[in-house]
Amino acid sequence: MALKPLNNIWIRRQQCPCGDWKCYIRLEEDESTITKSEIESTPTPTSQYDTVFTPYVGQIFTTDDEAFEYYSTFARKSGFSIRKARSTESQNLGVYRRDFVCYRSGFNQPRKKANVEHPRERKSVRCGCDGKLYLTKEVVDGVSHWYVSQFSNVHNHELLEDDQVRLLPAYRKIQQSDQERILLLSKAGFPVNRIVKLLELEKGVVSGQLPFIEKDVRNFVRACKKSVQENDAFMTEKRESDTLELLECCKGLAERDMDFVYDCTSDENQKVENIAWAYGDSVRGYSLFGDVVVFDTSYRSVPYGLLLGVFFGIDNNGKAMLLGCVLLQDESCRSFTWALQTFVRFMRGRHPQTILTDIDTGLKDAIGREMPNTNHVVFMSHIVSKLASWFSQTLGSHYEEFRAGFDMLCRAGNVDEFEQQWDLLVTRFGLVPDRHAALLYSCRASWLPCCIREHFVAQTMTSEFNLSIDSFLKRVVDGATCMQLLLEESALQVSAAASLAKQILPRFTYPSLKTCMPMEDHARGILTPYAFSVLQNEMVLSVQYAVAEMANGPFIVHHYKKMEGECCVIWNPENEEIQCSCKEFEHSGILCRHTLRVLTVKNCFHIPEQYFLLRWRQESPHVATENQNGQGIGDDSAQTFHSLTETLLTESMISKDRLDYANQELSLLIDRVRNTAPANCLYQP
């Protein structure tokens, strides 16, 4: 059996982060996964016949293949299989007779026994069954058709039930998607029996219910072994040549675009290991919205043996923007460290405030080493998607009960409460020695809600943003059938996003006012349509909350139906500072419904300026680096000036006194700049 190439060189990463190289996770969202209903359906090619009656002499078919499909479908439902026997042809008509017979028709001819001490005796399934269907070709007025000339449905053996007939060789098929998965697992060192068990687990079927048996998998792997070896040698050579082509493309792009940056590493044999690149628009976007970064490592290339890492940011309209790409030779801490170092260097030394990733111990260590002052957050959705692969087989029927306990665990109010509940949970389900449970516990500070609530993540943990990243990546990898196209596809996506960003405010209309509150109208004139819609939703929900002012100053806010816990809000009218125990503003940069409710109760008609973050405003701080003739300044002066103005604006907006002082000093500074003679012009007008 020949090795079939993969449909796409980029596939979802399935290696489990637990450290066991033989452990894989099931991808529940993988579209190629065959559902249980598909497994239970007929594994032969889809038949056009919904209802099949017993064939009869004189029945007419357009082609002999159509007749074979009809008879095969009839046999499948009747409890046997068929095979093609004799065919007869002539010079004028070609093949004019076809004989289809029961799989147990005829008798095996005696074979010469091998010259071995204990020859293997194999009992033949053929028993002289008379089940058959003979076809004859007839041509009438130049049109040929086939009719049944003989038919017998008399069998001298027992017909099989449906759960047995599916195991006949004629109906045992390994589909293309399963072939690819089997080869991946075999290459990773999985024995055949474990491959079968893993496929049963992934497809959610009971043991023995796959459309093929262990013997078929063993034969398939054996047949493909030589092809796999040849394919590995070919792909090694192809990876080297494609990598060099990618570097040449990067070099050419850097010559055409001075803002494009790239870098690579080589091994001791001077062969390229890792490659990274970023576009000028990405670097400029990071200077505005580089506070939160998502590092996605969902895709890897099996043929190339490379991991694709993509850095994303989120702009003031809630859109994902590509910041940079890396191709890594492996998933080690060393490779991730180089990726992070290179990314920070591309972004001119600026570290993000928060970085969000999948759960991975190597990546966790690299972030702790290279970004010690950056908050590391693991997507909860990524953890939840792995729970079934980690624990469903171990816990069996108790898995759903475990999931309920885990969900309750995530609602722990503090770390001490989590520690107590965690010990009870793992002890109750016997998971104390489990490596996946140990992985979760070791990374708890990065995914536990009560631990990450104070980390600023903008709106990157929303389902809408995650869907936009998935869609972005799918567009890139679907069109990237080689490394060079990966560079081109990512460039197209960055260019399209940058073009859209220039028009996004005129294109997006603001939601109409819903509460008629002065605060709502005030925010509408400051925030982008996206940020305003998020804040507006909190305003609408705030009217459902009751407020009780305590004697010592704080406010207790709770839902009128007490559907959730109470929140403590502290309001300082002198400094116009407000804080809520839910930490929503610290988490997303948008005031929560609890604080908005307190502001309303205290007759505040405007939201304090410091609670309109620069990143969510209509006009983000941006100093143009191009003159009217389109000529870029091109040095680090503009970037330095940009950073200074951004810092100045951030610090000035903290209080009214600071803002007044900054305005006064800036007016004097502008006058001085205007009166300074331009000794060295940065560009010619």
Swiss-Prot record:
Annotated InterPro entries: FAR1_DNA_bnd_dom, FHY3/FAR1, MULE_transposase_dom, Znf_PMZ, Znf_SWIM
Coiled-coil zones: none
Domain of life of the native organism: Eukaryota
GO MF terms held by the record: zinc ion binding
UniProt GO BP: regulation of DNA-templated transcription
The entry's keywords: Metal-binding, Zinc, Zinc-finger
Record-stated family: Belongs to the FHY3/FAR1 family.
PANTHER family: PROTEIN FAR1-RELATED SEQUENCE 10-RELATED
Record-given protein name: Putative protein FAR1-RELATED SEQUENCE 10
UniProt source species: Arabidopsis thaliana (Mouse-ear cress)
